Amino acid sequence: MNGQNIRIRLKAFDHRILDSSTREIVNTAKRTGAQVRGPIPLPTRIEKFTVNRSPHVDKKSREQFEMRTHKRLLDIVDPTPQTVDALMKLDLAAGVDVEIKL
């Protein structure tokens, strides 16, 4: 696989699970002889929701909730066939969204 890169983009709501999954991918890629660039932390997306505390009155009394989506980017440079096989067999934690681009 000469001259080809694998770009892996990870997303999760919990940054600890995201970091552990990133560590697993980096260790697997390095073990099979590929060069890894990253993990690069991408901007965290914060979605805020504002709702009334009471169902009927008190418009001024509100509560805010937020949902944070943490993201990481990995580049695997010149992957070997063993690297691709090892990454396909890798079992990551639930709650981590993985996008792979060749």
UniProtKB/Swiss-Prot annotation:
Write the record's keywords in alphabetical order, separated by commas: Ribonucleoprotein, Ribosomal protein
BP-aspect Gene Ontology terms: translation
**Where does the UniProt annotation place the signal sequence?**
none
| GO cellular component assignments | ribonucleoprotein complex; ribosome
Q: Pfam families, per this entry? A: Ribosomal_S10 (PF00338)
Q: Which GO terms describe its molecular function?
A: structural constituent of ribosome; tRNA binding
Known role: Involved in the binding of tRNA to the ribosomes.
* Subunit description: Part of the 30S ribosomal subunit.
Recorded family membership? Belongs to the universal ribosomal protein uS10 family.
What PANTHER family does this protein's entry cite?
30S RIBOSOMAL PROTEIN S10 FAMILY MEMBER
Q: What is this protein called?
A: Small ribosomal subunit protein uS10
Q: What is the lineage of its organism?
A: Bacteria, Pseudomonadati, Pseudomonadota, Alphaproteobacteria, Hyphomicrobiales
